[in-house]
Regions:
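Alpha-helical bundle regulatory/interaction domains
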Residues: 1-173, 177-186, 192-196, 209-210, ...
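Long, low-complexity intrinsically disordered regions
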Residues: 186-189, 200-205, 212-215
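Residue-level "edge-of-site" marker
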Residues: 202, 217, 252, 268
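A secondary-structure capping/hinge motif
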Residues: 205-209, 254-263
Length: 289
């Protein structure tokens, strides 16, 4: 069922925008089950803060001083369950760029050296849990120019890695996405032939979150994706499809993660669908295998 993970494409707060400061490149087919995209760009003078929403992803981010040819900041940002803003570093008189790998929440563990327990809403140095990958990336990123070249190199590094795959973790991800976060924890665990307590330990170690949190985030993102794609245009249909108690419950949950009222998005859902059909999501540049 790896195709379910390949088809799962979480959206950011600005799914219709591609700029010099932020562009996305999809990974090759072999990595799509674990990685959402590679992203980055040039940070311009006076760049405004970037709005962040929960996308059920974790990011390995490098900020590079192109003028001096060195990495000035690197971080691993765990899965987030809150909306907020991110400020990009700038150096007067220097050109600064960003390069990042956006892992699916259920995919980062495969390239990590250590468990991801405690990384929810976390911000730490990549060497803490991704030492091998961090060293390999630091060796070449500053000397490479442009997002495409850095993506090609990072992808070659990731493909050469001995991933620590866990079949039960992969099956858990398939089940979660198949139900789009609407199954109860006991139903989810039963489908995996384990107890709810075992599921909680499994996800805590490999995803850095509880089953309840994972379900809530996937349900929110699945709802947001359908609205943005224009495939869900009625709030009452959304209540029934995603198992909310009523419209008020849906609105509260959406505002909790998105920081805005969902009604505005439903009003523009048909227009959103046409926009995405015409432009795509950050019109991605597919990486050749």
């Amino acid at each position: 069922m790896i195709n379910i993970r390949r088809m799962w494409q979480p959206l950011t707060a600005t799914p219709f925008l591609a700029t010099a400061a932020h562009h996305e490149i999809l990974p090759c087919k072999s990595l799509q089950g674990w990685i959402r995209c590679f992203w980055g760009g040039i940070v311009g003078a006076g760049a405004s803060p970037t709005r962040i929403i929960p996308d059920v992803c974790a990011d390995l981010i490098y900020h590079i001083d192109e003028t001096a040819g060195r990495i000035i900041q690197a971080s691993f940002c765990g899965v987030s369950d809150v909306c907020g803003t991110a400020h990009l570093p700038m150096i007067p008189g220097h050109t600064v760029s960003t390069f990042a790998i956006r892992f699916h929440a259920f995919g980062a563990y495969a390239f990590a050296d250590d468990a991801l327990r405690g990384t929810l809403n976390g911000f730490e140095s990549p060497e803490v849990r991704f030492g091998r990958l961090d060293r390999a990336l630091r060796a070449r990123l500053p000397e490479l120019r442009g997002l495409s070249a850095r993506t090609a190199y990072a992808q070659s590094v990731l493909l050469a890695f001995q991933c620590r795959e866990n079949p039960l973790v992969e099956t858990a991800a398939d089940a979660l996405l198949c139900h789009r976060g609407t199954a109860t924890i006991s139903e989810w665990a039963h489908e995996l032939f384990i107890s709810s307590r075992q599921l909680e330990r499994l996800l805590g170690e490999y995803w850095g979150m509880t089953p309840k949190k994972g379900s809530a985030l996937v349900r929110y993102q699945a709802l947001y994706q359908e609205i943005c794609h224009g495939t869900l245009t009625d709030v009452h249909d959304a209540v029934a499809r995603y198992g909310f108690a009523d419209q008020a419950h849906l609105c509260r949950e959406f505002r909790r993660y998105h920081g805005e009222n969902v009604s505005r998005f439903f009003k523009t859902s048909c227009e959103n669908g046409r926009t995405m059909e015409e432009n795509g999501v950050y019109p991605p540049e597919e990486v050749s295998t």
